[in-house]
Amino acid sequence: MNHSLKPWNTFGIDHNAQHIVCAEDEQQLLNAWQHATAEGQPVLILGEGSNVLFLEDYRGTVIINRIKGIEIHDEPDAWYLHVGAGENWHRLVKYTLQEGMPGLENLALIPGCIGSSPIQNIGAYGVELQRVCAYVDCVELATGKQVRLTAKECRFGYRDSIFKHEYQDRFAIVAVGLRLPKEWQPVLTYGDLTRLDPSTVTPQQVFDAVCHMRTTKLPDPKVNGNAGSFFKNPVVSAETANALLAQFPTAPHYPQVDGSVKLAAGWLIDQCQLKGTQIGGAAVHRQQALVLINEHDAKSEDVVQLAHHVRQKVGEKFNVWLEPEVRFIGASGEVSAVETIS
């Protein structure tokens, strides 16, 4: 076990894997998976490692998905993009804007690559991937059979999809299809975006505002390792939300279509005065309470203990129990993040 995973996870946690393989096409990915499986090893497929926390050394092969390529089909009503799973997400957002194909600007600066975007149904500032996803192309690892799932078949939810359930270990995402309508409609429901005028705003202005909000609030993983938002924004019943709002009338809350209410995890953590709290080398970020950072050579145990502490404090004060958005990886694969920090 001497292949360091530190360069392959944005948290910068130093654990090792038995083997690390970069796959630049589907065949290389299948070969690496089949070789490791024949040896009886667990296999983990990673993009840019921007949403994982390695808890210990990984007893198997980590495959880095670097399948590239962008194809564009110009239709009368929309642009259709077919994008390789290994393409960087933010670079794609910039590229589509430069080419005059707006629609992804709210999702600027989300770390990671295209292949990870459907797994989490990534989202920010009022837009989720499902809004623009046309399909996801996968390969069944055991057989090499190609499968195309429509957006509906992906069963997208809040930071959720079929790729976290039935398709988790049996399939690898090789490409994502996006549909960007030519009739652009700005989404200006969050943060500084609410100050923009919907009748005159341009996609570039939305992009600039999102980049400004993210760079001023969020730490750069190159300076302080992190995995972006550590916790999901909790979705609670209207009853729970009303009880909380009776006590804390200023709490940010976002009613959902199904009658539930989404709360702001960052606000809940902030109300517990946890910004700057440190355990070992891990800390709650001082500008954005939703982000846990590797401040100084943090061990994975430091991050787990800090996450547990934050969850307990918020639970005791608000009776709302936060769940990590980050995926926890043990020696032979993903483990329950909630159980790990409970």
Curated annotation (Swiss-Prot):
Enzymatic class: oxidoreductase
Catalytic activity from the UniProt record: UDP-N-acetyl-alpha-D-muramate + NADP(+) = UDP-N-acetyl-3-O-(1-carboxyvinyl)-alpha-D-glucosamine + NADPH + H(+)
GO cellular component, one term: cytosol
Domain of life: Bacteria
Pathway(s) this gene product operates in, as recorded in its UniProt entry: Cell wall biogenesis; peptidoglycan biosynthesis
UniProt function note: Cell wall formation.
NCBIfam families linked: murB, PRK00046.1, PRK13903.1
Entry's family note: Belongs to the MurB family.
Protein's name in the database: UDP-N-acetylenolpyruvoylglucosamine reductase
Organism: Escherichia coli O6:H1 (strain CFT073 / ATCC 700928 / UPEC)
